[in-house]
Amino acid sequence: MSCRKFNAPRHGSLQFCPRKRSKTIRPAAGAFPADDRSQPVHLTGFMAYKAGMTHVVRTKTQVAKNKQLSREIMDAVTVLEAPPMVVYGIVGYEKTVTGLRRLPIVTAAYVSDGVLRRMFGNRYASKESAGQFCKGSVCESRVEMIKERAHCVRVLVQTQPTLIKGLGLKKAHIAEIQVNGGSISEKVEWALGRLEKEIAIGEVFGVNENIDTIGVTKGKGFQGTVKRFGVRKQPRKSRKGIRKVACIGAWHPSRVMYSIARAGQMGFHRRTEKNKRVYMIGNGSSNIKTEFDLTEKPISPMGGFPHYGEVRNDFIMVKGAVVGARKRVVTLRKSLLRQRAGEELVIKFVDTSSKIGHGRFQTSAEKKAFYGARKADIAAEIH
């Protein structure tokens, strides 16, 4: 024990206390970007489903004193499938001395079954009464109230999980997303014109833009202190356990402090990650190619993403990892920080090899050209 240090930094961050399970699997955005009324009316968020990860090769340009250098960098990226969202309601908030207060909601004439399932479950009576949210003069009076008294306007949107076969979801995920830009009346008219209509992810975000991701991490269950906080294991000769904290506090105060590493829930926490760079926005049904890699191929790897499948709808590619398991809903939001002029984004290569093993080929045609014709293919041609 001669080399033992008697002082060390604490293990585990106290930033995310308490470490408990999230209330919902789709956490709402707690804040939205500041409203700039000089800009055109636009939406500030979107919902997508995590598909999986791959990697890309891009060119980075560095400017030195007398020369300009460029080198290739490989980045890990996350692909999220984002089918178009549907607007089914409008809500306004007025400013009071105690904060924002919600005004009456204006809903569309038709609300899909996915929204009713999410709001009322399978209770038939509730769904019948919910089909008459507001109609006629009631809606008109509520719209006028929002125009006169609202400080900010948000729209009620729903996802379309039935477009993704691998999810097996009937309940749509619903959320409130703020509308920024323009005056209050312009925002209300913009929202009224998009009731019961789809909004694509390309209308909200752009390539080379920084966004925030809000989601729930993978759940790990009840774990000990070594895995949960990363504390050091005790020596082999220790009594009454090795994977535990040796001293949990002083004699007085005669209680265990909250800052002591203890066993408990790990994972399934709500987390917000800021300034994720958007690398690509496209559609899974169309092929992609770059200026350097002219091979046309789908965004899905060979065999599909493990435990997810193939991406067939709109998708967004984000640099780095995104919290949560595959098939989990993630809320994307425009960055709260001021956008800075970033470097030019030049993607040279997108990897689409199989993620099930050590993939060698980018497309099935490339694999067939390498191995040649199979017996099954020859037999199929004969018959």
UniProtKB/Swiss-Prot annotation:
SUPFAM superfamilies: Translation proteins
Keyword match Nucleus: no
Transmembrane segments: none
GO cellular component: cytosolic large ribosomal subunit
UniProt superkingdom: Eukaryota
GO molecular function, one term: RNA binding
Keywords, sorted A to Z: Cytoplasm, Ribonucleoprotein, Ribosomal protein
Subcellular location: Cytoplasm
Pfam family, one: Ribosomal_L3
One example of a Gene Ontology biological process annotation: translation
Family note: Belongs to the universal ribosomal protein uL3 family.
Annotated protein name in UniProt: Large ribosomal subunit protein uL3
Underlying gene: RPL3-1
